[in-house]
């Protein structure tokens, strides 16, 4: 189950393998590994096999299959999938099921992808870790003693371990990029509006994005081609960029100006992480790219992000507050209480900071094609071997994933690409950011990073 999504789809379209065979292989992989990983909240074996069988019948009758023909796809459990659980990692929502597909899921199905199940996330996606009150914590395929990150925890773990070829995640503060960096896979947070949110849910925030996770930039680009595009049900959705992301991911250009920011803000990057990222930067320079180290002066954005994110969290649960106080984790309750207590003037000030950060980045993009940073400030965090949790998780946010916040505040695209491992064999991601609307440029440069570091084909031990 480590063939690329592109290879799987091509083989299914050409009849070299059936969609049902691919689906069964994915389900067997889940059965063999998920008792350890806990990537999936719900596996829809029956529905996946039925969908795969329909594709095989259609192909035999002459129907031309789509871009994602037979590709096994995992979906984060906060994204609606018709008939499947949508419990968002919370006891408050236990037993709830969706009665329709999200637009992005419908587009995946229309491209003949096969949804195999719902992946685990921390409660309401409030933290970048892999545990929730609903069950055992999701583990990192590279090391069961370390977090897979979050909040698209199960999605990244499933892709890294070969349980799925692609996954759909969400990102309000790094929730696609954090677990992708931790699990050694590619995660792309598109420009705000590139992938529509439809139907719009309560608590929707302009910091929240839908996006793809895959084992290569090419696979992520192929999925983005399918799920991107304007829809009238999301007023923030964008028209097509007018490019084919999959084609851009195959470009072999070796020119361009890259701004290298080893540190954004005040937090310090772990030496081991920094050395791995520096090796990637040197590889880019050796391949002809112009790399300029920058030390951008940016207004502190962490407080602004926390205000806007916690207001979003509060709006998600405001109609269920009594249940939240009774059933939810203290770390979620703390966020909700903060969000409920935020004053209107504080929101206005946070929005002003958002504009200032946006302007600061835009000035940089006048001189550079992309900005690259270490995705995370430290390697995947160690967890309790029994619970999969870490001590004092709230204290880690600024020290660990501070580099995630700016792209959510500004709506600019950002992609985490694996570039190597630490001395302890834990994955390290490099974040590639581009100006708003420039997803194609980010995909192009992310692919360049991938080629320069020769990561493709690297697998965790659980593989």
Identify what each model region corresponds to.
Residues 91, 95, 237, 304, ...:
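Short, surface-exposed loop/helix-turn segments at secondary-structure junctions
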Residues 26, 48, 220, 258, ...:
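Residue-level signal for inorganic ion chemistry
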Residues 68-210, 263, 375-393:
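Short glycine/serine-rich loop/turn segments
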Residues 32, 110, 160-266, 278-287, ...:
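Structural helix-boundary/capping segments
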Residues 68-88, 247-262, 310-362, 374-378, ...:
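Short helix-loop capping/hinge segments that flank enzyme active sites or metal/cofactor-binding pockets
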Residues 1-50, 60, 286-287, 458-463:
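An N-terminal boundary/leader segment
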Residues 16-24, 53, 244-248, 271-295, ...:
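Acyltransferase
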Residues 8-14, 93-96, 208-215, 337-342, ...:
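Short, well-ordered beta-strand elements within core beta-sheets of diverse protein domains
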